[in-house]
Amino acid sequence: MPRPSEPSPYVEFDRSQWRSLRMSTPLKLSEDELVRLRGMGEKLDLLEVEEVYLPLARLIHLQVAARQRLFATTAEFLGEPQQNPDRPVPFIIGVAGSVAVGKSTTARVLQALLARWEHHPRVDLVTTDGFLYPNAELARRNLMHRKGFPESYNRRALMRFVTAVKSGADEAAAPVYSHLLYDIVPGEYQIVRHPDILILEGLNVLQTGPALMVSDLFDFSVYVDARIEDIEQWYISRFLTMRSTAFADPASHFHSYSTLTDEQAVFAARDIWHSINRPNLIENILPTRPRATLVLRKDADHSINRLRLRKL
């Protein structure tokens, strides 16, 4: 529980303390399902789901119910009709963190667990990759070397999308990004129709600014954290694996990397990390960590053993 030191807006837990907060929340995820959710190079197992993600899912479940009661109270005060129980105000969750830290896996596991509660079965997951400017526009703006940095996103379009979902629009459309093509897919959209919960996953979702930002619309947020040196190693390992998987596809934007030797691939991955991903992490992503409701801290083996929950 809280360390007896200086006052902090957080409560810190080790894994043994956190897992006790699961209470009687049942595990409704099979090993086969977990394999499909697990990211490349990650070692997430059902024990970690039980000890880390089930307590988190329980906390979010409780907060969803509390938030709906708050909306009902506000509606009563304003003399407005009570909301349709089949169309609750969507609960928005942000999931942030570096490239290769495992935030996509965290988002997918949360989606799977939260959708198993009968009170909020409609859980949509959207990544901010779809709101990157198309490559042609990035090239026009001389931003191809800054892809993934805040300025490479159409932040107005992202804000319109999240606002539409939050305000109860019948449907909202998110552009689709192809990692194979390394570009937006023209004319293809992910349609979100009044979900109970929307999970928005991306590098910079917790950013702030002088104007309204998507993070201002979040009801809960998670930052997936690790030592920068560990994330670099995970990125390089993933890059090496992708030579024989995603990069091997002739249609891949990075197909030329598939023929690199181990030494060449490590050199290329390290160069990309130090020229793009590490600066983006240090300058833009890491500074948003204090805004997260919950920080999941990973060890070098990808396991989560420390957590920090914001209480204020």
UniProtKB/Swiss-Prot annotation:
It catalyses: (R)-pantothenate + ATP = (R)-4'-phosphopantothenate + ADP + H(+). InterPro entries: P-loop_NTPase, PanK, PRK/URK. This is Pantothenate kinase. It holds the Pfam family PRK. NCBIfam families: panK_bact. It comes from the Bacteria. The gene is coaA. Gene3D superfamilies: P-loop containing nucleotide triphosphate hydrolases. ATP binds at residues 97-104. It is found in: Cytoplasm. Keywords: ATP-binding, Coenzyme A biosynthesis, Cytoplasm, Kinase, Nucleotide-binding, Transferase. PANTHER family: URIDINE KINASE. Belongs to the prokaryotic pantothenate kinase family. Signal peptide: none annotated. Pathway: Cofactor biosynthesis; coenzyme A biosynthesis; CoA from (R)-pantothenate: step 1/5. Its main location: cytoplasm. Its EC number is 2.7.1.33. It is an enzyme of class 2 (transferase). GO terms for biological process: coenzyme A biosynthetic process. CDD domains: PanK. GO terms for molecular function: ATP binding; pantothenate kinase activity. One of its GO terms (cellular component) is cytoplasm.
